[in-house]
Structure formats: structure tokens, C-alpha cells
């Protein structure tokens, strides 16, 4: 059974999310099938550049599944990667720029890959119980994301478990 093993605050450098926008979680299959994540990784400079982004480090080489939630509006899912600020955006992709100093509340969810999404609903409470305040955007929507970091999420440990990062934007 997967469980939340760590909760912490992380401050981002100026960073650019590059990806594709979907109306459901099924976009992951399309991203992999079309090689779109590889395109983003390459245009961002590859794993070596992503691993060494100032103030972001090893979290840089990760697939990101952004989610926008607002009552009365359809779910938005944006799948892609964070890249250094001002990275060129390939044609057909969308981007969101985050300024330096953007804060995240991060939960590490440890368990079998097939179970790591089960405790996501507990993350908001764990983050607020940790003294952080989740902040909506200017339109009142709450953004969160899963960060599938390599190798934390992609290489199971000796028990066959991985760590999925689940993040909210916080003050």
C-alpha cells in the first residue's frame, strides 16, 4: 500500500513548463506514443542540462502532469516537462512561465507504481498540516501536479517501490 513519506516546501527558480493540454488524464498515452516528451527534453538541453538547473537540481529531469481544478469548470490536464526559463517552445506545444520564487508544497508518495496515485487525495491536507497554504491562481483555480522524477519514479528500489512527487503551489 502506497503512503506519503515526506512533505516539504520547495522554491523554484524561474522555470518554464512546456507541454500539451488535454481534457483528461488519457493524454499520457498520446505524449509517449508521439515522442513528445522526448522532443521537450531535447529542446531543453537533455538530462544533463535539466539535472543541473540552478536551484532545481535532480528534480529537473521529470515528466510533469499539471492539473487545473476549479469548481464548475472542466478539469484541465497539461502534460510535459519543466525547462529552463526562456527555453524555445516547439510548434504545437503550450507553455506556462513561473517566476523565480514560486513555492511548492511537495508530498513524496512511496509504494508500488500502480498504487502511488491512491494517496494523492491526502496530499493537500498533509501540506496544510505542514504549515503551508495552498494558493489558487488569479481566477480561483487550484493547480497541482505529479512529478515523475527520474530515477526516483522510474527505477523501483529493492522492494519494487517508487516515489511519486505530488505538488501544490503554496505561499
Residue ranges with predicted function:
Residues 1-171:
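A solvent-exposed interaction/effector surface
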Amino acid at each position: 500500500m502506497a503512503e506519503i513519506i515526506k512533505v516539504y516546501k520547495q522554491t523554484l527558480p524561474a522555470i518554464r513548463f512546456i507541454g500539451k493540454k488535454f481534457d483528461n488524464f488519457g493524454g499520457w498515452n498520446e505524449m509517449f506514443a508521439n515522442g513528445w516528451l522526448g522532443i521537450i527534453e531535447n529542446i531543453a538541453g537533455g538530462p544533463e542540462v535539466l539535472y543541473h538547473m540552478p536551484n532545481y537540481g535532480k528534480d529537473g529531469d521529470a515528466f510533469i502532469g499539471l492539473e487545473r481544478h476549479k469548481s464548475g469548470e472542466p478539469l484541465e490536464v497539461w502534460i510535459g516537462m519543466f525547462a529552463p526559463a526562456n527555453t524555445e517552445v516547439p510548434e504545437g506545444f503550450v507553455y506556462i512561465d513561473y517566476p523565480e520564487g514560486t513555492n511548492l508544497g511537495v508530498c513524496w508518495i512511496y509504494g508500488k507504481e500502480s498504487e502511488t496515485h491512491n494517496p494523492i487525495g491526502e496530499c493537500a491536507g498533509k501540506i496544510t498540516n505542514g504549515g503551508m497554504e495552498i494558493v489558487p491562481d488569479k481566477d480561483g483555480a487550484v493547480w497541482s501536479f505529479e512529478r515523475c522524477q527520474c530515477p526516483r519514479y522510474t527505477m523501483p528500489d529493492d522492494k519494487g517501490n517508487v516515489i511519486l512527487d505530488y505538488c501544490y503551489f503554496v505561499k
